[in-house]
């Protein structure tokens, strides 16, 4: 919902209001003293120890015990039980809760998968204090009695989305359904929301382009400025902003129009007076006595008729608590003229406007209709106009489009439908869910697994090629929105099969050999068993690592659980999967400088974060993959071993060897040559990603563990453990059970 700007907030501190003297003595991070120091905090986020429910807590199992109908009944009661401390407009909190759910989900962006409703991040800074989220702190407080009642059985993330659904349904709109499964976070995510901390500053660069991975056009907004770009009431320019922002949040033009038109059917905007004169600090800056609430309003009653949120004022329809076609009909039947709200914000009113909208608190008073600049944009933009007029002429089509778009908005960041919980999950599947076919065959058993591993190793494929393929397939996973991974074997499909990082020609030959093994195993069987290519890809990687460990003198067996299935090209949205392409993968020593804004090292940390790795896991994984010789393009950078293809700790031993002197390579930026200090002979080449494990004190501390004489077996054990983790990151069918 394109709502709610608070121009009063110019800057935002993401800490509690603390006396200056105390702040000066507070502990500081390394970056305070050394701004160029490497920040490893993304790999320490959401540690299980920070979860008060403990390491054995299983949210999926808790949710399955929830009486969802009882929760819905309680939500319906809250909707129409107005509280004196924050009265409901028109006696119904429904529109308020729709905005809460929308803004919780609407931070999602396609390029890095960050944002969205999963985790309930709206509770934390900076989102809690964003101007676009003004007064949503009260919405969550209204829901606290319900959260308190059901506790661990329903997360804040699920409760907020469910409440948005119930709000829509209570006002006469039929939603598509609801899926639970959003597990709460316990701290703020580390997300790049834009350059600087000035609220409402333009996120575009000096060339007018919105840098990736950003989606919102201004700092502190969910999408775009409803007054127009940077507060300028230009509907044509606003349409351009809308199209770009919504596209970066995975919405096409039709979905965008449906969401705006559907959302603005309900409720009103609040701009009773000047925010600069009336409002206090946002929650993150408010005093302790406010107990986490912000934007205290000192003007009038401070709420109700005196409420100030966005600075814009009024409603889009004459019936703001029911689903009608009025938004679209009002948009076209009136000539709209520019005006200002009581707070001084740009908005639009009908020419010769009549007082037809009932007051939110006094049924004897009426006001004119209003529209945002972003609403008028849907009328003046040629493509949006085609859609809005079609929806106006076809109400049932509009209803279905809004229902589908709302479901997508509130579930897009949850990943595949295998993560969905509850009895209200729609039966229909959608291409944006990255659907997978169900297995209609019996799974392979332990004897079959041993047989298949043996056959894979006898194909003539090298261990290196098998490991590279398994890594390329599984490492597309990103825990930010649970997309990617090996399940589906989409590495054989467009666009993944052609990504440069995957060495397409080599990949094709490996997949062809694995498919031959698959076909030979599956054909003419009477026992009903089959093996998927996606299972074989992982099994091949496992077999190769076991073989590499054997060559190094270690006997290991990597656990394997079958059950992956193979998606078709028709089940794969090429443009949607394109955003998963690794333009940098430090684990394969790959970096495309032309397509990256992060450095190779920062890109490694970012990818490790998406793979849900800790600092030790990232470290041991790098060390193992280097000696297994799996670099993209066959690069020997960082292959610090004389026995490539053997799983051992040589990478760390040789990296920390003081007989090597490292110098910058004259051949390529970001690469280094390692020379023997005595003879001057070239021993190794390495990238910045390799050398950071000897340069950064924290990474070196972990590297020293694995380089130690008594850690050889530990290294092999730890590497295979984290390898297994990465191969199974997308196995939600296992995790939820």
Swiss-Prot record:
Class of the enzyme per the UniProt entry, highest EC level: oxidoreductase
Cross-link (Tryptophyl-tyrosyl-methioninium (Trp-Tyr) (with M-249)): 102-223
S-S bridge residues: none
GO biological process, one term: cellular response to hydrogen peroxide
Cross-link Tryptophyl-tyrosyl-methioninium (Tyr-Met) (with W-102) residue location(s): 223-249
UniProt-recorded Gene Ontology molecular function terms: catalase activity; heme binding; metal ion binding
Entry keyword annotation includes Iron: yes
Keyword set, alphabetical order: Heme, Hydrogen peroxide, Iron, Metal-binding, Oxidoreductase, Peroxidase, Signal
InterPro entries associated with the record: Catalase_peroxidase, Haem_peroxidase, Haem_peroxidase_sf, Peroxidases_AS, Peroxidases_heam-ligand_BS
Entry superkingdom: Bacteria
Record: active site: 103
Keyword Metal-binding: yes
Residues binding heme b: 264
Post-translational modifications: Formation of the three residue Trp-Tyr-Met cross-link is important for the catalase, but not the peroxidase activity of the enzyme.
E.C. no: 1.11.1.21
Site note Transition state stabilizer, residues: 99
Cofactor requirement: heme b
PROSITE patterns: PEROXIDASE_1, PEROXIDASE_2, PEROXIDASE_4
Gene Ontology annotations for the cellular component aspect, listed alphabetically: cytosol
Residues annotated as signal peptide: 1-23
PANTHER family xrefs: CATALASE-PEROXIDASE, HYDROPEROXIDASE I, BIFUNCTIONAL CATALASE-PEROXIDASE
Family from the record: Belongs to the peroxidase family. Peroxidase/catalase subfamily.
Protein name, entry field: Catalase-peroxidase
Biological source species: Yersinia pseudotuberculosis serotype O:3 (strain YPIII)
Gene: katG
